[in-house]
Amino acid sequence: MKKILVLLLMLILGIVSYAKADDVLGTWLIKEKGKIVEIYKNKAGEYAGKIKKDNFIFLKQNNDLTYDKERNSLAYFTLKFPEDRFSWSIWINIEKDGSLFIKGTGNTEVGKYITELHLIRQK
């Protein structure tokens, strides 16, 4: 009986953390760039994102996606906008107000750069 209870509890906790990770799905406005984007799961079940205006894929999930319950964040993704010279390695924090905060680094020949973006859910 005790084993069944433990298994049931583990299953419920897994479902709750999965639901939290899926909080990134939907249509968002990137405040800093003024772009409307959609984050979705592709046919392979991986997270991806596209710019609504031209369907440019700007966000791709890296191989080993991890969800940190304590920080309420998903890591790692590759982010690249058409106007950028290089891509960014980023993670996504799900904020308490439901918005998303993206932070990451990009490496070039001359140094390392940091980016921060704020996404607001669109209805």
Write out the residue ranges for each language-model feature.
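N-terminal helix-cap/turn-to-beta initiation motif at the start of protein domains
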Residues: 16-27, 116-123
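Non-catalytic surface loops within mature trypsin-like serine protease
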Residues: 53, 94-96, 123
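Predominantly extracellular/luminal cell-surface or secreted proteins
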Residues: 52, 105-107, 122
